[in-house]
């Protein structure tokens, strides 16, 4: 069956699912394979649970004569081709977003701002890979007049694959930093991979990028593209400055031809979120959202999922940034915490994963920076930090840290919690 015919079937379905445990009535189930599972084996269950059709790529799982089964050569490729075909049919303007740090927060901020005057489809959570991007595109409906599609990468070529599926009309790279070094091989590999967004947009005649003018790496690879620039310099499309950060980020912004600044009080923690917020201002303004609506949207946005969240417990004030960590974001968080006005500071930091051959060196740099900042009350969690030279308390895993917190609970402290999601630092919150 060709993709046009599959698309016609898709249009009769209520939604698309790849999880046989979650099959809404009338949905299309697509059987994917992984290292430890074969979705084909669950196609029958999906149909019993509510799916109207099931796409499988092993004929043995499709009973002869049952028209609810659609047999294809490769289910994953079919998912991606179907998403691309649907995207072309909808013709919705798409803003593609990638970057090492801040892309999910920026996506949320952009979508919040744009939703003031537009019907916006945007990536849910961080479904930003070769499966998540197609699933996002397949949620496009005629009533959507804009889409914000987040794209993640952990290996060279990942962004190239995703932009060819999504075919964005606009692009933004939040920044480039040291993450997934194990997959990319080097910092240069990261720049090249993130730059695949720009490479694709150069092939589109009317394409536009939104660029943080203060970032030299982005400026270097943005040649030959129509640019809408934002940053700290005068004369840019949007110009802005941080005005406060204790603990919430406050900033001002104005357009290139305005003389008066707009002041925004956010619920975001950290100066490192300023470029993310300014990107949302820029894109909102570009798409016709009024300044007052932009300011209101940003002021009302509350971060979720352990991303720079402020939480007050009965005993302490917590800054929870335990969703992910890499050398760039870790340095930014520590630097911001250093400059924050607060007494009795404590840091709980977890290992940074997927750094490959650079891992030992990058963890040592963080330990050295903590010493340089003069922090005394620090708990380092994980085997990678344990192997560094430092004068701090070290724990092999979060279980050991929790045992210590149960013996002696900190009180009256402002505590930064930062580490890779796999370290599970979010589980310490209830003990603080």
Regions found by a protein language model. Give the residues of each.
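N-terminal leader/targeting and accessory segments in enzymes
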Residues: 1-81, 85, 340-342, 367-382, ...
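Residue-level signal for inorganic ion chemistry
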Residues: 27, 46, 82, 97, ...
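Mobile, glycine- and charge-enriched loop segments
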Residues: 20-31, 120, 131, 135-147, ...
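Acidic, Mg2+-coordinating active-site environments of NTP-dependent enzymes
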Residues: 60-65, 172-317, 342-343, 368-377, ...
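ATP-dependent carboxylate/acyl-activation modules
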Residues: 97, 305-307, 422, 426-428
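Active-site beta-alpha connecting loops in nucleotide-dependent enzymes
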Residues: 34-37, 303-306, 323-393, 420
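Phosphate-binding loop of NTP-binding sites
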Residues: 77-209, 213, 217-226, 260, ...
């Amino acid at each position: 069956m060709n993709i046009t015919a599959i698309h016609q079937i898709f249009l009769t379905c209520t939604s698309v699912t790849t999880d046989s445990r979650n099959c809404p009535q009338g949905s299309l189930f697509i059987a994917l394979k992984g290292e430890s599972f074969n979705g084909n084996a669950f196609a029958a269950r999906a149909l019993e649970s509510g799916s109207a059709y099931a796409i499988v790529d092993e004929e043995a799982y499709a009973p002869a004569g049952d028209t609810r089964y659609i047999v294809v050569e490769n289910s994953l490729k079919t998912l991606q081709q179907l998403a691309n075909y649907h995207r072309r049919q909808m013709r919705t303007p798409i803003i593609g977003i990638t970057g090492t740090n801040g892309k999910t927060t920026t996506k949320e901020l952009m979508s919040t701002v744009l939703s003031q005057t537009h019907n916006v489809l945007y990536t849910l959570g961080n479904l930003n890979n070769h499966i998540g991007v197609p699933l996002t595109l397949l949620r496009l409906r005629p009533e959507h007049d804009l889409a914000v599609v987040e794209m993640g990468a952990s290996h060279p070529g990942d962004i190239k694959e995703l932009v060819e599926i999504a075919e964005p009309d606009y692009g933004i790279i939040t920044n480039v930093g040291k993450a997934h070094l194990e997959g990319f091989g080097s910092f240069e590999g990261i720049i090249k991979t993130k730059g695949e967004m720009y490479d694709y947009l150069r092939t589109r005649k009317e394409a536009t990028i939104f660029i943080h003018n203060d970032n030299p790496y982005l400026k270097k690879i943005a040649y030959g593209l129509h640019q809408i620039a934002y940053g700290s310099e005068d004369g840019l499309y949007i110009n802005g400055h941080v005005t406060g950060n204790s603990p919430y980020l406050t900033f001002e912004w104005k357009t290139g031809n305005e003389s008066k600044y707009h002041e925004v009080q956010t619920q975001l923690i950290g100066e490192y979120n300023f470029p993310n917020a300014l990107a949302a201002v820029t894109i909102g303004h570009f798409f016709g959202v009024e300044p007052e609506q932009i300011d209101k949207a940003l002021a009302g946005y509350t971060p979720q999922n352990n991303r720079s969240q402020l939480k007050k417990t009965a005993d302490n004030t917590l800054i929870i940034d335990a969703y992910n960590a890499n050398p760039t974001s870790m340095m930014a968080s520590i630097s911001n915490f250093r400059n924050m006005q607060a007494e009795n500071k404590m840091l709980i930091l977890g290992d940074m994963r997927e750094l490959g051959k650079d891992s030992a060196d990058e963890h040592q740099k963080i330990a050295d920076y903590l010493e340089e900042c003069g922090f005394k009350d620090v708990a380092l969690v994980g085997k990678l930090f344990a192997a560094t030279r430092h004068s701090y308390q070290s724990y092999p895993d979060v279980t050991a840290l929790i045992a210590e917190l149960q013996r002696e609970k900190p009180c009256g402290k402002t505590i930064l919690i930062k580490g890779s999601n796999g370290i599970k630092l979010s589980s310490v919150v209830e003990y603080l």
